[in-house]
Amino acid sequence: AQMGCASTLIGHCEERNDKMGILAEAGVTGQAAAQAVSRILNQEIKCAQAAGLTVLYCIGEKSEEQADWENVLGAQLDIGLDGVDKRRVVIAYEPIWSIGPGKTPADKPYITKIARFVKARTGGLDVVYGGGLKQDNAAMLASIDEIDGGLIALTRFSGEIGFYPDEYLDIIRRYLGK
């Protein structure tokens, strides 16, 4: 906050995965590790808020967790948001199973189902989509009433993978319907 930052990203799937790996080395795995990671992230959220930052809190399920998505996402929300100022939190949903080159993106009914669940579980917090908002799905994502925006890290997921400003602007235009 002292450097002019207003918000921070906490709990990105890669961050969660790194923390799970550290816990696995210590012999903690499965649900116990997932809950421990959410408790660590909860402390990160509290520290960020104490510093005056708004938090973009990422949640998501892996392919092997899809059948149990309600419990997985519910625990991430309940533990991660315990005792925090929810007025200063936005939820970023990352369907981990669908992120990356060659993966099948989550479809509109699935994303809608998850966003409704998150809003119901959190008392209506804003939900942004973090599972690959790109040119070919921006309009579809914008058409989901329960989605309040998107998280864009890369603009190109194949070939020359990376972030390209012109493509970023095109994604925004398509999301806004322009």
Predicted regions and their residues:
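C-terminal helical cap(s) of enzyme catalytic domains, especially alpha/beta-barrels
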Residues: 22-34, 156-178
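Conserved anion-binding
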Residues: 12-103
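Glycine/Thr-rich beta-alpha phosphate-binding loop at enzyme active sites
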Residues: 95-126, 133, 161-163, 167
